[in-house]
Amino acid sequence: MSTRDRTETTTEVGLLDALLDAYQGEVFGVAMYRRVTESLDDPWQRWQWECLTRVEVELRDELAAALLRLGHTAIPDEGEHAAGLAEAERIVGLPWLEMLHEFTYDLPPLVERYSAIAVDHESAVDVVGCREVLDRLVRHEVASIEFHHAELAGRAPIDSIGPVVALLTGPIPDPPIE
């Protein structure tokens, strides 16, 4: 049974579906990033991945709050969680740079998709108060791309993860002690 209020406009329903899709994408991402983090032995790589995971968690929670403001409870889809774990298993064990290279294909389409949500539903985005979370969603994907490219270019771990760390609103994981 749908919990959608009959007074929602078509634009709001489209926005709701887009936000639900983005939320489930973060459910996938949290599962994947956590599993990859658990698999890493190098302390700097593990720290970087923990930072990436924290951003995923924050965005998942922010999207859940945005959905709640729209009157909908975000329920993590077990299929998305399982798919995130399966994706992690596919890349766990790959050499570091090869694993990072895998993400260079997946992230740019997400920037386009999340940017399009705000444009396609412009009239509803501000009304329901979700522009900030959509903007942050785009910035997080862009920061992830910057991280992957910086790592592939050989930048220092503390520098390459900088754009991601800058997005964290909660506590920043402690970097490894050398």
Positions of PLM-derived features:
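Non-heme di-metal
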Residues: 2-178
